[in-house]
């Protein structure tokens, strides 16, 4: 009997989780944030339900501050695959003029991401939402179950989680409740890139190094992606060879200096990396709210 490789076991587990959700829930949806984890999750969904298409739509919570290359990639990918994409923007936040520059990262994230996600899930009537979070990313995610239950107000209680034994998942929920499902929970950042390399999965070019205009702000290399970003006194964008380990809203996402231009090179960097990929996320360093507090309020 042929033994499965590490990546084959992870793939099989993720596909099993996706099929369980479709079997147990009335109206699932897949959160598609356009990054590497979302790209892998989408690839797994295509495999899980082949030759048909995934029996659920994709949902992108758009803050309007994503990198331009992310939106181009999103639209091209969805069109090429012929998938159903729902894009939701918190129009109340837009009307209030909420931006990453006139609010703290914590308040901005709550209004344009957390509240926007709640709106989208309620308007769509979704009772299960796939997300691409992994346990190795951050300590609060490390203790979250694969089937992560939410109250009717979308709140997560880390002290009240159901046991998950072997590959058995209890999806019973009361009216108004829902779950967030994390089929990549047991993957690492290195696993993700090795799988992308193995399966030749397309990803946003921002993951690869090239000269980009950046400023150093609060110790992070912030890319000046468009003319909406106000420069502080003394700031002057300079071209540096950088790439991104994680992608979010461009004013809140720090780049890393690199010359890596392909997936094999990224894997090489991962093998010697000693810092978390989320170190470049400004929202994770905002003293106003920890990731666990954000998740309890309904964040991804």
From Swiss-Prot:
Belongs to which family?
A: Belongs to the PAPS reductase family. CysD subfamily.
Q: What is its EC number?
A: 2.7.7.4
Q: Which UniProt keyword terms apply here?
A: ATP-binding, Nucleotide-binding, Nucleotidyltransferase, Transferase
Which enzyme class? transferase
From the UniProt record, list the reaction(s) this protein catalyses. sulfate + ATP + H(+) = adenosine 5'-phosphosulfate + diphosphate
Q: Could you tell me which HAMAP family the record lists for this protein? A: Sulf_adenylyltr_sub2
| Record pathway | Sulfur metabolism; hydrogen sulfide biosynthesis; sulfite from sulfate: step 1/3
Q: Which InterPro entries match?
A: PAPS_reduct_dom (IPR002500), Rossmann-like_a/b/a_fold (IPR014729), SO4_adenylTrfase_ssu (IPR011784), Sulfate_adenylyltrnsfr_sub2 (IPR050128)
- PANTHER family on file: SULFATE ADENYLYLTRANSFERASE SUBUNIT 2
Q: Which domain of life is it from?
A: Bacteria
What does the record list as GO biological process? hydrogen sulfide biosynthetic process; sulfate assimilation
Assembly and partners are described as:
Heterodimer composed of CysD, the smaller subunit, and CysN.
Q: Which GO terms describe its molecular function?
A: ATP binding; sulfate adenylyltransferase (ATP) activity
Q: Please report the name of this protein according to its UniProt entry.
A: Sulfate adenylyltransferase subunit 2
User: What is the name of the gene encoding this protein?
Assistant: cysD
Give the protein's biological function: With CysN forms the ATP sulfurylase (ATPS) that catalyzes the adenylation of sulfate producing adenosine 5'-phosphosulfate (APS) and diphosphate, the first enzymatic step in sulfur assimilation pathway. APS synthesis involves the formation of a high-energy phosphoric-sulfuric acid anhydride bond driven by GTP hydrolysis by CysN coupled to ATP hydrolysis by CysD.
């Amino acid at each position: 009997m042929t033994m499965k490789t590490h990546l084959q076991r992870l793939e099989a587990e993720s596909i099993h989780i996706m099929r369980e959700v479709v079997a147990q829930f009335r109206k699932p949806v897949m959160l598609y944030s356009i990054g590497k984890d979302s790209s892998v999750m989408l690839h797994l969904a295509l495999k899980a339900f082949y030759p048909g298409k995934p029996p659920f739509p994709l949902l992108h919570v758009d803050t309007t501050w994503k990198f331009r290359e992310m939106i181009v990639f999103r639209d091209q990918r969805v069109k090429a695959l012929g998938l159903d994409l729902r894009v939701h923007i918190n129009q109340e936040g837009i009307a209030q003029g909420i931006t990453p520059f006139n609010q703290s990262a914590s308040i901005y994230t709550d209004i344009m991401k957390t509240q926007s996600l709640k709106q989208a899930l309620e308007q769509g009537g979704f009772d299960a939402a796939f997300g691409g979070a992994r346990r190795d990313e951050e300590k609060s995610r490390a203790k979250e179950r694969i089937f992560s239950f939410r109250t009717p107000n979308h709140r997560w209680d880390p002290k009240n989680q159901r046991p998950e034994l072997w590959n058995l998942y209890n999806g019973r929920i009361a009216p108004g409740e829902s779950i967030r499902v994390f089929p990549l929970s047991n993957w690492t950042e290195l696993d993700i890139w090795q799988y992308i390399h193995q399966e030749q999965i397309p990803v946003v070019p921002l993951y690869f190094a090239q000269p980009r205009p950046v400023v150093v702000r609060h110790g992070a290399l912030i890319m000046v992606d468009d003319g909406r970003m106000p420069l502080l006194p003394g700031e002057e964008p300079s071209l540096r060879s950088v790439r991104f380990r994680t992608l979010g809203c461009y004013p809140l996402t720090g780049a890393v200096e690199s010359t890596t231009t392909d997936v094999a090179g990224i894997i090489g960097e991962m093998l010697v990396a000693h810092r978390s990929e989320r170190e470049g996320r400004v929202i994770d360093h905002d003293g106003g709210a920890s990731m666990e507090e954000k998740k309890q309020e309904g964040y991804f």
